[in-house]
Amino acid sequence: NIVGVATAIVSGGPGAIFWMWVMALLGMMTSYAENVLGIYYRRKDPAGGWRGGPMYYLRDGLGGKPGRVLAVLFAVFCALASFGIGNLSQLNSIAGNLQAAFGVPEAVTGAVLAAVSAVILLGGLKRVAAVAERLVPAMALLYIVGALTVVGVHITAVPAALAAIVKGAFGLQAAGGGIVGYGLSRAVTWGFKRGAFSNEAGLGSSVMVHAASNVKEPVQQGMWGIFEVFADTMVVCTLTALVVLTSGFVEPDTGRIAAGAAGSALVGQAFDAVFGTLGSKLIAVCILLFAYSTTLGWSCYGCKAVELSLIHISEPT
């Protein structure tokens, strides 16, 4: 939502944001479908709670040996992904930004977060949910208010930024020497990559948590899937893009990064231009909250994947 959007602009130009929006529109549909299926095919566990996810709707929906094989494969790959997309990349962003903003050694950050994570995760899904329901609104509000302030200061540059996004999406801008790989292909590639990485729509991972919801109607949970993709990409990621493109560190007409700008650190530099040195510190805190909440969520996904593949996939259909 923060670093990823800046990277997309650096690597694919402003047009990458347009294709990120396209990915979000497609993602709303896939998120709706996977969450409806997750509720429809979920089952009661011995404790009276709900368990479900792609393993269940692949196994029970497709049926037979192909369904079981795909269910187990999903669980294995989801467990592996929890160490990559859900852990290593997130903690690397946290440690790097805290070291740059506050001088905290990366090893210290890793040790502290590991200890705190252990305490939270040992409490199970309910404790993770309790932490997330307090953390997510606070972090979203903090970042959105900060981003709106930056965009408000540069409000006159917003039309040019939006025009750059549309022109860049179809390769209509002049090539900029400071950008890595301009043109339609790069814009589409980076827009779709960062869109999928941002909202996870279609990956099936978040369905395991959605399936535990106390709702009776599958469509209701499917609508929540649509909303979370919209809020994540269309609101937060778009704000990040406008922060970067209106800051003066990227030339809207060419997409070229201005001299002295630092690629993936563009968001922090844009905040510094408005808030002074407090800006990069604010971004470091936002990245800490965003990335750490992602780590907690993916830790649950990994545990659920292992649990459901080793224990529940073998139960009768």
Predicted stretch roles:
Residues 10-48, 232-239:
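Extracellular loop-to-transmembrane helix junctions
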Residues 70-91, 109-114, 149-163, 167-217, ...:
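Hydrophobic, membrane-embedded alpha-helices of multi-pass small-molecule transporters
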Residues 34-42, 148-164, 172, 176-182, ...:
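Extracellular/periplasmic helix-exit of transmembrane alpha-helices
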Residues 26-33, 111-125, 136-156, 189, ...:
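Selective recognition of specific alpha-helical transmembrane segments in multi-pass small-molecule
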Residues 74, 91-98, 105-166, 303, ...:
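Membrane-interface loop-to-helix entry segments
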